[in-house]
């Protein structure tokens, strides 16, 4: 019989904090690592972008977490997990989980267990206004408790799988670099336009540039996918993790918020510039933080435009033109004004054919990674 225990019973759980930014003495020449979500990039966390002083630690809700503490993101980006290899503090978007008795639960087992439940936690978080879970909710989360020998066997197996995934992920990254290199070879870099292409704006090759619904319908367990900027950050549309709305609510929405095949979706709020191609005829809707680019395919190849928009110069252009303080937003008028090469459609198609061939290799590698995860 499987035994489950609540996280609050097997771990000491605390949230982080942020010293006042207005007090330089809390930050200048600090030597205490201060972890943010973007610092959780892999299994082990060994460094941070920012540091705070001992005065900043003592005059804020930040807490010093010891090496071996499991970090878990509880705000905005939910369910990211890492293990501290150093003593550090964290901000309030991160919870620190310190195992009370490591003879019963290994931190590394806890890491893998929590990582496997990310989709469940994301669904739980979407039930609240700001996509977050609080410490009370986290403490109630149940974990399967097995004996230490089995925990070690699971850790050993998953470490091996992790190594394979890292290697295959590197291969994927190399394929991405190959595609970028081919783009520059055929069209040049948008930063310099060394081929002297005439320039257009994005609106010149678009039939519609708009965004999705502004009032969120009620979520349901099964229904029509509702895609936001959050589901675009990997470069493709993550339908499987998107919240769902009812078919009746979907039908009541304006058609502008219902993308069509060969449209490009573009994150316009928060993490600006993530984009993905709609390569299916399935029905779904988008939120207001995702822009829909409906294209005139007689003027532009969607695959070519997708990679053009991902070029560093265009990404930087979009970030420079974004408005707002706490949360940046790229307004529709600025999206329409994105500068665009006017290059032959035949050459764009040639590039798209190259991408199609590379995608065959991508598919094989991703399938191998998926098998490893399963």
Model-derived regions: residue spans:
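Low-complexity, Lys/Gly-biased intrinsically disordered segments
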Residues: 2-42, 60, 195-237, 252-254
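A generic structural signal for short beta-strands and their flanking turns/coil linkers
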Residues: 31, 91-93, 223, 241, ...
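Active-site/binding-pocket entry motifs
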Residues: 40-41, 77, 120, 208, ...
